[in-house]
Amino acid sequence: MDLRTMTQSLVTLAEDNMAFFSGQGPGETARRLSGVFAGIREQALGLEPALGRLLSVAHLFDLDAETPANGYRSLVHTARCCLAHLLHKSRYVASNRRSIFFRTSHNLAELEAYLAALTQLRALAYYAQRLLAINRPGKLFFEGDEGITADFLREYVTLHKGCFYGRCLGFQFTPAIRPFLQTISIGLVSFGEHYKRNETGLSVTASSLFTSGRFAIDPELRGAEFERIIQNLDVHFWKAFWNITEIEVLSSLANMASATVRVSRLLSLPPKAFEMPLTADPKLTVTISPPLAHTGPGPVLVRLISYDLREGQDSEELSSLVRSEGPRGLELRPRPQQAPRSRSLVVHIHGGGFVAQTSKSHEPYLKSWAQELGVPILSIDYSLAPEAPFPRALEECFYAYCWAVKHCGLLGSTGERICLAGDSAGGNLCFTVSLRAAAYGVRVPDGIMAAYPATMLQSAASPSRLLSLMDPLLPLSVLSKCVSAYAGGEMEDHSDSDQKALGMMGLVRRDTALLFRDLRLGASSWLNSFLELSGHKSRPNLVPTEEPMRRSVSEAALAQPEGPLGTDSLKYLTLHDLSLSSETQDTPELSLSAETLGPTTPSAVNFLFRPEDAPEEAEARDDISTKEEKVYSVRAAFPEGFHPRRSSQGAIQMPLYSAPIVKNPFMSPLLAPDSMLQTLPPVHIVACALDPMLDDSVMFARRLRSLGQPVTLHVVEDLPHGFLSLAALCRETRQAAALCVDRIRFILNPPGPATPAGPTTPPV
């Protein structure tokens, strides 16, 4: 169904339902249902022309006709998903509204939530239109200095997001993955309650499990709490949450479902300099020094994974590098025969926003790769930010890559073909490691497979970045905090000093007491929530006669006396309300002042701001508050009468970031000069159509193709960022993971005669 037909069908159904409920008397329920359908009609009619304009020019930003993908297309697709859900729900209401089994309360809550989502999507469509108007032809990232990114920041950070994390969570993704996203969101908000209590990882996880009942029952509460967490908690919270998968119990469970391999060893590479032959003249060598940045020389951890035991992998030299990971069970299987060295090697760099995870959490899909490809895989455990900011991770990955090239024989490979593979932040490091190898003059890999890579860490507005408003895995503020930590803007958290002082037995005693306390409170909370919900469902009147202690987000908005949709609700401060702050003293003023956005430290790189827009932070704030309001007034963002919903959490702490380090080509490879990009080997990118970082992949591929570099771009539909870690979840993620394996296989076994990219080192 095309966009116009879908919109017309939805409008017709909305008008029919609106007329029906308007004639049901003066009851509150009928009034709210009539009002919500009136809102659906209004937003759908306003959204359709904006989406049509975006779709009419979206093809100009594709890599080619065979790869129709960019942020504009993704926004249109997301809005279509929301319209399709509302169309389905409106048809259901029209068919069942007279039935005695019609669940009025449930359907009303769902319609309200999706109306809020549709309103916010309309705002994003207008933002995308403005980007389209001011961007250079064919450019997805804003590169001008007109101050439009300041205007984006001022408006975007205050948009209401909770509706996307409650009932509408993951509506844009494939249905098979939505239960997983709901589990993640419930775990996140529950984990947030126990964060900073000085509990150990297992205790926090267990406590969160038993106190999450009310978040599972109440989607509106979950959405509001999710919004609070993403806007207020620092990078250390996200580091702790993402590292839950590193807990021994959980990692063991994950490994039980993964492929069984003969070799999975954690190695510690000593910080010793060594020589590498130059590609131009193998008789000459260059010294590869150990990592030095920030913390001085130190070992680099890597994990060797091989489906078969190959020659060299059980050598004494390699065994001397093995690092113990705890007690191992008795090996009862007979010692296998050694397979010959593989002609290929995969060097893998994991993702995690530069701040979290290790090869251990990525081991399940790496084992599958080792089995399917039949080659050894070396995964690098680089040091993480904020404790080890840029360029420490790059130095460690480059050192480990060079060590692997030189000592490939120990890893069970002859090194004829070498592939660099990584996802997200790991994809970024794959590109920069290859650029550094070319700069040193040593062998570059034969190809790079990057899954949903981050190639643009400099702050700049783009249409796909707008998707971060609704993405449960990559919200805008989380992206900002991760990049800030990697750039050195986040200081190390020393809040664990008390844990060290307690000692192991003290931690165990304290965590046991806290766990039993949380079990008791969690059971009570869950029972109260269940009884409250049951009591609510048993009432004949859906709206209680007394004001409850806490209303849902949608109820609070619709219960206001002004207008059918409660447009004056303080839960959703509109742009109009904020612009009248001089007349209403209790409404906060929306500006980029230090009072609004926090201290002017480089602690929050935002993805909607370029450093050029703020060469001097004090001048930039003054300039934005005066000149930018004249040129890009807040009211000019939207048509007359349209006001998106605003967050009750206040502005995200995202001050302007002016450090030039984010423009470093070894940090943002998209900004590298042509001469550097021309040194890259063939690049194969697998991106997600609904990923806030989609434009990174599209623009990087366009840039390489314009230079005549071999590059392919494959875009998978309806999956979130990070699908490799979800490979076993459903058919769609398995197919996407198989595409990554296919790209690696193409690099290792190219059609026609294969020639190494550089001189190979004799196996050690």
Curated annotation (Swiss-Prot):
Enzyme Commission (EC) number: 3.1.1.79, 3.1.1.23
Biased composition (Basic and acidic residues): 325-334
Broad class of enzyme this protein falls into: hydrolase
Subunit structure: Monomer and homodimer. Interacts with CAVIN1 in the adipocyte cytoplasm. Interacts with PLIN5.
Species: Sus scrofa (Pig)
Post-translational modification: Phosphorylation by AMPK reduces its translocation towards the lipid droplets.
Effect of G296A: In strain: Norwegian Landrace
Entry protein name: Hormone-sensitive lipase
Keyword Cell membrane among UniProt keywords: yes
Pfam family for this entry, one: Abhydrolase_3
